[in-house]
Amino acid sequence: MKKSGRITHRIGVALAAFALFGLTATIASATPSTQVWIPSTDIQPYKTVHLNFDSYIRTGKEPASNVGYFGIPDGGNLAPLYSVGPTVGVLPFEKIKAEVGFDLLYGGANTPAGLDKYPLYGNFKIGMPEDNTWIPAVAVGMYGIGTKSGNVNNGVYTKTGTNANIYYGLVAKNLPVVGRLSLGWYGLNKEASVAGVYDRNGSEGDDNGLLASWDRTLSEISDKLWVAIDYQGGKNAYGATSFGASWAFAKNVSVLIGYDIYNNKDRAGQNTATIQVDINFP
């Protein structure tokens, strides 16, 4: 995966809220060790401090139906979303590892929704690494742990909230030649406007879904080149198919360039290009 082993990162970008009652859409998330978009089973080593600097840039203008929903002018683009934050390995054991972290998120739909005032999102993960037998890597955790509680009434977000509080479980296994395959499930708090479970018409989407990914270091070309494709299911602001490639410029520094295709643009907005810079200390 992009972090850990190499370098690891993750940001879940969440959009949504409601134009009714003056509530505009929002964008939010937090970042454990990830693939391009979804969490991975990678966990930061003990005392390793990982810093991520991520940007998500919209590649198209929002359709007229999304203008009020996201609080932007007719025919406008959502502003880029920026995320920065640390993740730290906290357990000294070989067979069980854990990491904790937080992110500060600014821009995107958070700005018109007034949620730049609540930029802090937490994350944590605990799991077991893969061994050299048949036993896969296993990880469970949470991300997108926001500080502002939202509320929904009859399908309408009556109060914006950043507390998506996404919980998940994953298993992963490396296969010769093929690379690593990961599979899991997630759930979230549908009352958080950033989760976008309800659309502007009050139609309910999904508050849980599939997680799946493939990633591989392309050592045939260079040990510095890593690629991945991942999928987060569900009709909400987080559902997306993403792909990207990362280059390790140093032992502890990598840069990923990727693209996110959202499952439901009424809830998540237009697709995004992403640039993610990851640095490990020491």
Annotate each language-model stretch with its function:
Residues 1-35, 282:
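Cleavable N-terminal export/targeting peptides
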Residues 23, 89-93, 174, 236, ...:
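A short, compositionally biased micro-patch
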Residues 29-167, 175-177, 188-189, 215-225, ...:
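Transmembrane beta-barrel domains of Gram-negative outer membranes and organellar outer membranes
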Residues 182-234:
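A mid-sequence, solvent-exposed acidic-amphipathic segment
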Residues 192-195, 239, 267-268:
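A short, polar/proline- and glycine-enriched secondary-structure boundary/capping micro-motif
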Residues 205, 217, 231-248, 252, ...:
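Contiguous ligand/interfacial binding patches
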